[in-house]
Amino acid sequence: GGAGSCTGWPISQARGNYVARAAANFRFFADHARLATAEVLPMDSGHHAYTRFEPAGVVAAIAPWNFPLMLETWKIAPALAWGNTVVLKPAEDTILGRLAI
């Protein structure tokens, strides 16, 4: 248990900036998702170009063993924020705390 086992770092470092920065990744990408809008773009030829937001669907995220929490949130947060389902595959060497995310 505890912050150290969840991050793979000594508790003193995990309680510092590490977990807070990982949480900030979710906040950043949640705010970024408001850009997911449909638009009508006029073109010179009298036509219009239409954009449409659609999630990709299922996103596979493969995370390495080093710096696990931060690298996982960099992959998970944008995929979830833009409406996708995420399947996370942590490295076999990664601590078991990764399965809780």
Language-model segments: residues:
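N-terminal Rossmann-like NAD(P)+-binding subdomain of aldehyde/semialdehyde dehydrogenases
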Residues: 1-47
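Rossmann-like NAD(P) dinucleotide-binding subdomain of oxidoreductase/dehydrogenase enzymes
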Residues: 38-101
